């Protein structure tokens, strides 16, 4: 095994991702492609001991020189875990910039043919350029029985539009063979590729396939056509918590406790499987027909996070971003407990803990402002929210090695039997008044009133004959599993 060497080191000015200020960072570029930044210059013995503020890989990177927003700026476009990121740096002279660019490019070129065989399968390697340039190393371990008939668009009746987003739409469908109802998420490949969301989408598919928990949305099938990816998921027709809270303005503490407990149970399960959710927000929390929580939309999940492991990709809704994300630092599982704090604050207080239409001001509030609580809150609720919304992730409730157990043992949840939570034995405080599987009263009629337009079915007739090499971005995407076991 080759010894990892420091190829180049020195001070760089790095631009913040959200708060666009320049911060001095001492960076080390190593022969294994790691590009790590520290607040202070570490001495040689500290390299492996000090936790870095920034940790990137220059493998498969692209480099760009620019004189904006400052002279002698360069941008690195690279893969951070499974997401394509861009980071902006600035130095004092053109010569210094050239030295860094040559060093980074040399390391990146040297790594091109050195991917170990055992890592090749796991690396979801996103390359840049035209679709044909994308490596088929973007693979997913899909346990799929070979004898099972393949699923196509023709296997479903398309009933109602449930939602629309940047990448596609969600439609209420009925499986023709069984008469069962599902939510089908249809994503347009060209948009996913254009917006560098390939890795996020593959992550969503893999997380959905490998998780089974009462409060996580189950995946029934995943398949693709020539231009679309389709997830056929459990259909939760109780509506988004956002929908209900926006109509009721505030929930009682008991009701918030119930939803909070089910979210904690789901996060404990994900964290135990080394998955950090990262995008807890009301819009991603659905209710099923009985009133239990279903967490949806796994596109922002980051896989492979263990205690103490951190990640450096930017995603999430601005109002829900944790301070450590804004401060441009590595972050770990504690971001989910911050997210829980924000949604529980919304439920019990009827507003976001920090809000401003101006994002720069919003980020300032998240970083600096003390959390304020209405006088109507109980001491236990106040204590829980204050703990979850601690700025320092190490001090945050749930931020220690015990993770979810810290949250579960808080006084606010003293009345909760956690075994009963997981077994769905607690009575939901609100039961959606749905009269049938196709009752969409809790979905926005902005969508449900629209007619569904799909490409004519004959476009899909022979798509399952496509070989994986004709699908360079999404090989082995298909999946089939019984939700109702």
UniProtKB/Swiss-Prot annotation:
Phosphorylation on Thr-313 and Ser-478 is required for full activity. Phosphorylation of the activation loop at Thr-313 by PDPK1/PDK1 is a prerequisite for full activation. Phosphorylation by mTORC2 at Ser-478 in response to growth factors plays a key role in AKT1 activation by facilitating subsequent phosphorylation of the activation loop by PDPK1/PDK1. It holds the Pfam family Pkinase_C. It catalyses: L-seryl-[protein] + ATP = O-phospho-L-seryl-[protein] + ADP + H(+); L-threonyl-[protein] + ATP = O-phospho-L-threonyl-[protein] + ADP + H(+). ATP binds at residues 162-170, 185. One of its GO terms (cellular component) is nucleus. CDD domains: PH_PKB, STKc_PKB_beta. Its EC number is 2.7.11.1. Residues 156-413 form the Protein kinase domain. PROSITE patterns: AGC_KINASE_CTER, PH_DOMAIN, PROTEIN_KINASE_ATP, PROTEIN_KINASE_DOM, PROTEIN_KINASE_ST. Gene3D superfamilies: Phosphorylase Kinase, domain 1, Pleckstrin-homology domain (PH domain)/Phosphotyrosine-binding domain (PTB), Transferase(Phosphotransferase) domain 1. The active site is at residue 279. Keywords: ATP-binding, Glycoprotein, Kinase, Nucleotide-binding, Phosphoprotein, Serine/threonine-protein kinase, Transferase. Glycans are attached at residues 132, 135, 310, 317, 478. Residues 458-472 have a biased composition (Basic and acidic residues). The keyword Membrane does not apply. GO terms for molecular function: ATP binding; protein serine kinase activity; protein serine/threonine kinase activity. Residues 5-109 form the PH domain. It comes from the Eukaryota. InterPro entries: AGC-kinase_C, Akt2, Kinase-like_dom_sf, PH-like_dom_sf, PH_domain, PH_PKB, Pkinase_C, Prot_kinase_dom. The modification Phosphoserine is found at residue 478. The keyword Nuclease does not apply. Two specific sites, one in the kinase domain (Thr-313) and the other in the C-terminal regulatory region (Ser-478), need to be phosphorylated for its full activation. Belongs to the protein kinase superfamily. AGC Ser/Thr protein kinase family. RAC subfamily. Akt2-b is one of several closely related serine/threonine-protein kinases known as the AKT kinase, and which regulate many processes including metabolism, proliferation, cell survival, growth and angiogenesis. This is mediated through serine and/or threonine phosphorylation of a range of downstream substrates. Over 100 substrate candidates have been reported so far, but for most of them, no isoform specificity has been reported. May be involved in the inhibition of ciliogenesis. This is RAC-beta serine/threonine-protein kinase B. It comes from Xenopus laevis (African clawed frog). The gene is akt2-b.
